[in-house]
């Protein structure tokens, strides 16, 4: 029985020498037993190393084990453990359950039970207590230490409550993995497995109390125990302080020595690896700089390395993406110029959640194979999403989100067309709740396409049929966990999930790409993992009856804990991993990314359930727990030392100036320490380095070539021309086709339009149009084509939009106007009480008749209905005032009209037409109600963007000529009335201020006869207009001399007639162009607005003014006089080809 240490710094060759001695001894003693104990994650690599080193390429009498594997090997021999080992998933489930059961007994933690992450925290503290052999008695001692500290006492009381309930649950059925070694110590004396064996321990930086206890037993039974210790030989006999680099190693050696002395075990002189090799460093024989780093980093005092060297470099980059990009450029150089293999290179970071995907993407762009070493969370896997969304369907009673998460997980039997059709219907009618799914859906919503109710109801019936058993089981207050799990399993079987997953696996394998192989391995494991979680729930909680939400939370905890471990699909590839977790072996170059403050060392935002001060208090009373933050900081330096000294030839350190969100960040203190050791070490700026070495990186080089071709004006430099010819000649090949790249770089938009035949097939022989359609064409011909040619439309949603509110106002106003007519009450004589009661009734009827019942479905909708009533009351009051201010009476409401010519059959409705008859003359006033804040703009009318009022005036006059053939028809004006209930500042004349804000805007006949008919306040002496008058109902005011001011919106009667003729001709021209197949991208741009701003088709039209061939149609800004002059010269306009209204093209 003996104990011996193998001592040396990182890279000295401790493992190599240890394994060499074991192999030699095993060959000399073929019947001897040799055990090598390593950390769990190192077992596979150690086996590979030994097989490679062994002359017979086999390890017949050498066992490579972890502590847990050793325990199970001995249990097979002695028995002693009939209990199931509880892994993290099961542990989390039990912790969640006992916390829920005990939440009313908890003093501090009761409110945290449902907080995400708290189960993990509590599970962590329970594991820690078990790992350090702390049970109820020890917790009681901890409470005595905490006397006088109420907060800590309450914490410990709650921990005891949960821990006791946890241990009671386990009883004789389960055992924590942390307690396995304690159990092993109880039975190891009955085992002969380790008797007279030679035991070697390698790769450990320290041991837990349970492991030390086991080692004391092993020392007594084994022939010898040999332990590798990472430490400078000069530090062997020196006591290590906590802040020193080798404190952990020294503490481990000291404890093992004490165990040996206590048991009177022989302690052999240590094997000093470096001394035996004559000071020769096994790992760093090619790099004096890396050898100097190993000897001096985190040492006090340190020795500076003053020679020039390029084995260690520091590079500053703009952000993590720039770090990764520059690292990949250097990797490409190493592969090309220094003939490195992929497996010789590793990339590590302390923030894999940031760098993992970025590095992977850059390596793939460069065509470099890589393996990202991390355990993948299974929450995003389709099978888990299938189950979680199914649970949510029941938990949230068939709400939209849960239903469509389920349908879109990719494992149902519905086609995407069926799902899309079904989703459109559900959204259009706001369907939620199981009750709605139990009744056939018969209503249709407004759309350009036929609503296929048969298909929609088929999907509804399938969902209802397949979910009813699950719903009934999960919502029953009598269902046990076993029954609930069975119901979920039956759902998996109903949808044949196992078979579908098998098809996915075969598909991924057939595709053959590395990423597909990894996905195949993930999918191969997932179904088994899900069933194991089900089994664990049934084992642990089988006959318990839990509330649905609690059942879901516990199962979800299981899913969150589960991770898929993936094995690299190839040996020769770059390893990308975490600085602490990833095992690096025999690498020549190490790229360390993200060497920034907060990552190295890693920021610790919280101290867990027990704070640092509380842990230190227990440490002062010799109660050992996990390290404090301060101790962890020292440990981090030791782990950094181990990883920085892994490469044999090159160490590349990178840091960012900005984080991924663009915030400024600092470099890590580590770089300062390295710079002091290497005073001649320069920090490179990745942003300033030449791009010449970026060229030949397959897809990556191609991406840089693209940027140069796009951005460089004039002749490209010779270097880039040569690179271009390399790609063209095929000497460099990437996954991206150069032809496709060039098509994108030099793409120009050429638009030929449609043929007349195609246009007629799309639109018919005659356009069935509205004013809105013509305005859409005037704004952009392509947008018109998408909406009216291809019949694209926005998805109907179960909500109230501005157009809906406008429709509601219109209907309520129409009902109000008709009711007045039925009651034979004139607007001029409308009593206030009748107006108010009638308004309430009309809004109520409009709401009841509106759409799909949405106004009755939520508090917000009910509020909107109230708001509509308030605005209607204000509108009827204002309209009454406006009519009473003049002499006109409403002649018709919602007046239908149509107009047909060669290409266009125009149809529409005029909200209101007011009439006044005098001396055989009929004056016509047109009003259009708007729910927004629309203002009349003569320039917009000229360009075709605002045609409504002109079209309505023309149509109204035509209708009146038919109805009153013996009268002269005269236009009085056209107006927008904006439906609103404006807020005004408090003043003595609130009503007057509101009336001014609600005054109609539009265009008024400038006749001195007509204006007083619209507003009698303009009645002056002897047929003249009253001077210095401003109307509160129409856009007219007069100056001191009785003439119109510039602010008045007036036109002569002949100008109004010319305007209506111009609009007719303009729409004729538009319809002619549409039928000729004009569909060009030509959105207008005027001042600070353009046609694209509120366009519904931005995501599909492809318009990009940066691309050649696309440009805006810039509208020239015109004043009123210029517009009238142009309208009068309409022949000049209509002689031109397209929408050429003096507009110019430009980006």
UniProtKB/Swiss-Prot annotation:
Protein name: ATP-dependent helicase/deoxyribonuclease subunit B
Function: The heterodimer acts as both an ATP-dependent DNA helicase and an ATP-dependent, dual-direction single-stranded exonuclease. Recognizes the chi site generating a DNA molecule suitable for the initiation of homologous recombination. The AddB subunit has 5' -> 3' nuclease activity but not helicase activity.
InterPro entries xrefs: ADDB_N, DNA_helicase_suAddB, P-loop_NTPase, PDDEXK-like_dom_sf, PDDEXK_AddAB-type
Note in the entry: Despite having conserved helicase domains, this subunit does not have helicase activity.
An example molecular function term from Gene Ontology annotations: helicase activity
Keywords: 4Fe-4S, ATP-binding, DNA damage, DNA repair, DNA-binding, Exonuclease, Helicase, Hydrolase, Iron, Iron-sulfur, Metal-binding, Nuclease, Nucleotide-binding
Pfam families: ADDB_N, PDDEXK_1
SUPFAM superfamilies registered for this protein in UniProt: P-loop containing nucleoside triphosphate hydrolases
Gene Ontology biological process: double-strand break repair via homologous recombination
Taxonomy of the source species: Bacteria, Bacillati, Bacillota, Clostridia, Lachnospirales
Ligand binding ([4Fe-4S] cluster): 780, 1092, 1095, 1101
Binding site for ATP: 8-15
Entry keyword Transmembrane helix: no
Alphabetized Gene3D superfamilies for the sequence: 3.90.320.10, P-loop containing nucleotide triphosphate hydrolases (3.40.50.300)
Named cofactor requirement(s): Mg(2+); [4Fe-4S] cluster
Source organism (scientific name): Lachnoclostridium phytofermentans (strain ATCC 700394 / DSM 18823 / ISDg)
Record's keyword annotation contains Metal-binding: yes
Subunit structure as annotated in this protein's UniProt entry: Heterodimer of AddA and AddB.
Family that this chain belongs to: Belongs to the helicase family. AddB/RexB type 1 subfamily.
Cofactor binding note: Binds 1 [4Fe-4S] cluster.
EC number per UniProt: 3.1.-.-
């Amino acid at each position: 029985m003996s104990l011996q240490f193998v001592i040396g710094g990182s890279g000295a060759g401790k493992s190599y020498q240890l394994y060499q001695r074991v192999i030699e001894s095993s060959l000399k003693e073929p019947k001897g037993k040799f055990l090598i104990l390593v950390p769990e994650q190192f077992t596979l690599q150690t086996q590979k190393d030994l097989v490679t080193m062994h002359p017979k390429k086999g390890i017949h009498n050498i066992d490579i084990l972890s502590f847990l594997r050793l325990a199970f090997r001995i249990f097979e021999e002695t028995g002693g453990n009939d209990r199931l080992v509880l892994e993290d998933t099961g542990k989390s489930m039990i912790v969640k359950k006992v916390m829920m059961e005990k939440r009313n007994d908890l003093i501090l933690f009761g409110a945290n039970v449902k907080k995400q992450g708290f189960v993990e925290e509590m599970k962590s503290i329970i594991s820690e207590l078990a790992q350090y052999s702390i049970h109820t008695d020890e917790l009681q001692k901890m409470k005595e230490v905490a006397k006088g500290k109420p907060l800590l006492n309450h914490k410990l009381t709650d921990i005891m409550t949960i821990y006791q309930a946890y241990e009671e649950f386990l009883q004789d059925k389960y055992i924590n993995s942390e307690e396995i070694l304690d159990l092993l110590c109880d039975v190891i004396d009955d085992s002969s497995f380790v008797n007279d064996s030679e035991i070697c321990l390698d790769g450990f930086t320290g041991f837990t109390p349970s492991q030390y206890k086991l080692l004391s037993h092993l020392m007594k039974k084994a022939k010898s125990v040999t332990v590798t210790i990472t430490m400078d030989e000069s530090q062997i006999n020196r006591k290590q302080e906590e802040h020193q680099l080798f404190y952990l190693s020294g503490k481990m050696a000291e404890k093992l020595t004490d165990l040996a002395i206590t048991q009177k075990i022989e302690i052999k002189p240590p094997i000093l690896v470096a001394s035996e090799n004559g000071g020769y460093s096994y790992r760093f024989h090619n790099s004096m700089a890396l050898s100097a780093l190993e000897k001096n980093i985190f040492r006090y005092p340190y020795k500076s390395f003053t020679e020039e060297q390029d084995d260690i470099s520091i590079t500053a980059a703009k952000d993590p993406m720039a770090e990764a990009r520059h690292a990949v450029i250097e990797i490409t150089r190493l592969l090309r110029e220094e003939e490195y293999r992929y497996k010789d290179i590793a990339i590590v970071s302390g923030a894999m959640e940031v760098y993992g995907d970025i590095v992977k993407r850059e390596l793939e762009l460069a065509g470099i194979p890589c393996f990202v070493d991390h355990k993948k969370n299974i929450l995003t896997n389709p099978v888990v999403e299938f189950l979680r969304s199914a649970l949510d369907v029941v938990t949230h009673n068939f709400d939209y989100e849960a239903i469509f998460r389920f349908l879109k997980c990719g494992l149902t039997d519905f086609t995407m067309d069926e799902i899309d059709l079904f989703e459109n219907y559900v959204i259009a009618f706001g369907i939620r709740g199981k009750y709605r799914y139990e009744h056939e859906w018969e209503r249709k919503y407004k759309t350009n396409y036929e609503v296929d109710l048969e298909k929609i109801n088929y999907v509804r019936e399938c969902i209802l049929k397949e979910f009813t058993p699950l719903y009934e089981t999960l919502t029953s207050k009598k269902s046990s966990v076993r029954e609930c799990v069975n119901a979920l399993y039956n759902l998996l079987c109903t949808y044949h999930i196992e078979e579908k997953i098998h098809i996915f696996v075969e598909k991924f394998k057939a595709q053959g790409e590395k990423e597909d192989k990894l996905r195949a391995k993930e999918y191969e494991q997932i179904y088994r993992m899900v069933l194991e979680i089900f089994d664990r729930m049934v084992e642990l909680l089988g006959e318990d009856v839990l509330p649905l939400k609690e059942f879901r939370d516990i199962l979800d905890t299981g899913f969150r804990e589960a991770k898929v471990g993936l094995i690299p699909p190839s040996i020769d590839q770059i390893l990308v991993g975490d600085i602490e977790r990833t095992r690096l072996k025999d690498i020549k170059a190490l790229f360390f990314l993200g060497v920034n403050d907060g990552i190295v060392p890693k920021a610790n935002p919280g101290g867990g359930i027990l704070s640092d001060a509380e842990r230190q208090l227990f440490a002062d009373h010799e109660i050992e727990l996990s390290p404090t933050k301060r101790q962890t900081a020292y440990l981090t330096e030791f782990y950094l030392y181990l990883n920085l000294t892994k490469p044999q030839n090159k160490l590349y350190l990178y840091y960012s100036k900005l984080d991924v969100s663009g915030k400024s960040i600092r470099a890590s203190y580590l770089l300062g320490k390295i710079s002091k050791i290497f005073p001649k070490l320069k920090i490179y700026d990745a942003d300033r380095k030449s791009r010449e070495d970026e060229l030949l990186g397959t897809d990556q080089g191609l991406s840089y070539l693209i940027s140069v071709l796009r951005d460089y004006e004039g002749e490209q430099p010779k270097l880039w021309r040569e690179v271009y010819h390399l790609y063209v000649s095929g000497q460099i090949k990437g996954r991206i086709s150069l032809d496709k790249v060039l098509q994108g770089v030099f793409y120009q938009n050429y638009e030929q339009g449609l043929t007349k035949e195609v246009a007629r097939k799309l639109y018919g022989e005659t356009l069935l149009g509205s004013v809105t359609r013509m305005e859409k064409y005037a704004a952009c011909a392509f947008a018109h084509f998408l909406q009216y040619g291809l019949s694209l439309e926005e998805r109907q949603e179960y909500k109230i939009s501005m157009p809906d509110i406008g429709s509601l106002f219109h209907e309520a106003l129409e009902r109000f106007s008709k009711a007045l007519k039925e009651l034979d009450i004139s607007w001029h004589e409308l009593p206030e009480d009748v107006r108010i009661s009638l308004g309430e009734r009309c809004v109520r009827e409009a709401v009841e008749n509106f759409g799909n019942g949405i106004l009755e479905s939520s508090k917000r909708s009910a509020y909107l209905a109230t708001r509509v009533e308030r605005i209607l009351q204000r509108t009827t009051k204002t309209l009454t005032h406006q009519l009473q201010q003049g002499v006109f009476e409403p002649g018709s409401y919602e007046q239908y009209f149509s107009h047909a010519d060669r290409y266009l059959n125009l149809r529409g409705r005029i909200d209101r037409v007011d009439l006044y008859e005098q001396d055989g003359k009929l004056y016509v006033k047109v009003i259009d109600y708007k729910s927004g804040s629309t203002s009349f703009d003569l320039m917009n009318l000229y360009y075709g963007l605002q045609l409504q009022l002109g079209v309505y005036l023309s149509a109204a006059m035509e209708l009146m000529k038919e109805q009153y053939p013996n009268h002269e028809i005269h236009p009085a004006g056209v107006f927008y009335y904006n439906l609103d209930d404006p807020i005004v500042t408090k003043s003595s004349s609130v009503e007057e201020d509101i009336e001014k804000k609600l005054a109609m805007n539009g265009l008024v006949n400038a006749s001195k006869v007509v204006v007083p008919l619209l507003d009698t306040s303009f009645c002056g002496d002897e047929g003249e207009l009253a001077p210095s008058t401003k109307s509160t109902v129409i856009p007219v005011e007069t100056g001191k001399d009785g003439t119109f001011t510039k602010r008045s919106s007036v036109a002569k009667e002949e100008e109004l007639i010319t305007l209506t003729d111009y609009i007719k001709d303009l729409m004729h021209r538009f319809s002619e162009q549409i039928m000729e197949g004009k569909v060009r991208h030509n959105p207008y741009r005027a001042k600070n607005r353009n046609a694209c701003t509120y366009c519904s088709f931005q995501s599909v039209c492809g318009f990009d003014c940066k691309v050649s061939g696309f440009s805006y149609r810039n509208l020239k800004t015109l004043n009123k006089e210029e517009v009238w002059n142009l309208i009068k010269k309409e022949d000049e306009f209509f002689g031109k080809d397209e929408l050429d209204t003096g507009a110019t093209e430009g980006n």
